[in-house]
Amino acid sequence: MATPNLYWPVYKNLEKEFLKLADYIHISDDQTSIYSMHIADLIVRCSVEIEALSKELYSSLGGNMTPTDTNGDVRDLYFDTDCLDLLEQKWHISKKEITVSAINLYLTEEKHRLLLPRHKANKRGTSGSKWKQAYQAVKHDRRNSLKKATIENLLHAMGALYILNLYYKDERTDIGRVYLSDHNFDNRAGSEIFSAHCCHATCIAMAYHMDDSCISPPLGDELERSIYIIKYDDKSFREMHKNFCLDFQITEQRFNNSPEIAKFLSEHPEYKDKSINEICLAAGGDSLLMRIVCMQHSMGERSTRMEALLNKHSGIYPELLPPTTQGS
């Protein structure tokens, strides 16, 4: 029996309370420094959830639940320098980006709309993130630290909790068939305030040997910023590879048996190291290319599906080898 998710309902209730603020405050770029006791309370509640959830995720990653100090004595487990630091090592979580997308939040400046709420969250004191400094301040001295209980700090704390919840849920979402599909992934992922940054790994250079290096162009910084990866599901990826291999075998047979190609290469030996496509185009243009290159298996596929995968930096696609070496 699946373990019930106790964290998401709490997060959704915090979202509701935040959005109630927007009924009374016009939350725009020049209003983010507004502070109040109620906002302070929301920051504390939100941060308590962050502490609990970070420890859950730390445990799921095999973190040491009984750390020791320099003397070898068991010490408390710290949610930031222990738990969030491990999440940073595994998932690069400080670089994960979200967008404020609620229709009743009127934030137009990029610094208020595009958030990196986990940035420096694994640090302590003045080196840590501003929302975490605000949490510690209002928790221990609310009267003198109330000005730190701002909408901006609350929004960042909410964003940090949102990201942790997505990683805790660890959902793989079926987007549906590529062929004749009008479905898209809803990157709000259940939130009424935020949208998670996504990257697309669906532009692939087909080859006999397939893995993540076939994603073109390389995802680079987009992968670092992304919480979800839009990709072909593994079954479809394997089917695409199989169809490519079948088509390429036929293409090679046609190429090797073509009198036009043989004649051209005998007259132009400098082309022998070129690709099949380049040789065909030089020897006979588009018409020869269309007669040589086979696409019947690849073009006939109609069941290819896409999915949204949580980005854990653990690889996107399986490694696939040429048919002659599969399983050898």
Predicted ranges, named:
Residues 50-61, 162-172:
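A generic secondary-structure signal for well-formed alpha-helical elements
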Residues 46, 127-171:
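Internal, well-ordered interaction modules that form the hydrophobic cores of assembly/scaffold domains
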Residues 216, 220-328:
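Preference for solvent-exposed, low-hydrophobicity sequence contexts
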Residues 179-225, 232-233, 238-241:
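Short helix/strand-capping turn motifs
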Residues 5, 9, 152, 256, ...:
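Alpha-helix boundary/N-cap detector
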Residues 51-133, 138-144:
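Short non-catalytic regulatory patches outside canonical folded cores
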Residues 151-199:
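Amphipathic, Lys/Arg-enriched alpha-helical patches that create a basic surface
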Residues 1-46, 52, 56:
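Charged alpha-helical initiation segments
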